[in-house]
Amino acid sequence: LSTVEEALFLIQGLNAHDIFPDWIALNNGTTHGIEASGKGIQVDLTTSIHDALEKYRVSGAQHGTSGNSSDRLREIASQTRTTKANVATALQMVSWGLEVNDYGNAKLDDQGNFFKVRDQGMTEAMWSELVAYAQDQGWKGGNYKKLNLPFENKLLSQAGEIRNRMVKRVEEFIYNMLVNVLNAENTAPLTVAAILEAGSYDAGPKGERIEDPAQWTPEEIIKRGASISSDKGPEGDFDD
């Protein structure tokens, strides 16, 4: 897991050289795929790191949002400085027509197979083709996300009615997440106003240099980096 010390080392070093990131992504318990442990994102850890970076005006980018409960996502929205959330895996499963819970975690049977909802998402014939391909590759669970690339053209060549129902399913899922989980209801006018005020979609850097470049020379960076000690967790292959 990421630490306050590591995050400060990164952001302070960049700041000293006039680089002001809009976001920082942390290793804070996320799963890029399907969240199966029930632990998920560590909100307290995320909050402590974001608080330590407050004066650098860096927001949080939350990877691995898919599969974390709505309650945990509400905690992230209310307790941390997160303004960007990645939900790619959840949207993939939703668009395909798989059975998911209210926060996008696809349901699996005892053998690790997905449940396809009839007449939702892609056609049943297309789903059968995806499953057969995945079996040939030895893919299960979160590795199904790798199917998007080889099947992109086939998914896009389905009848308009099928493509539209895939889009509609994603639209409904995202609307619920934005409005009922992430507190984004009625924020579009605020975004439009900010864009108009800046005269661009790019509002420029939020931060400014407050670190002394003399303290962040290559030699000093190497020295500081060598003094950082943190628990990297157990060794092993944790690919999902």
Predicted regions and their residues:
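Glycine-rich phosphate-binding active-site loops on the catalytic face of alpha/beta enzymes
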Residues: T30-E35, Q79-E99
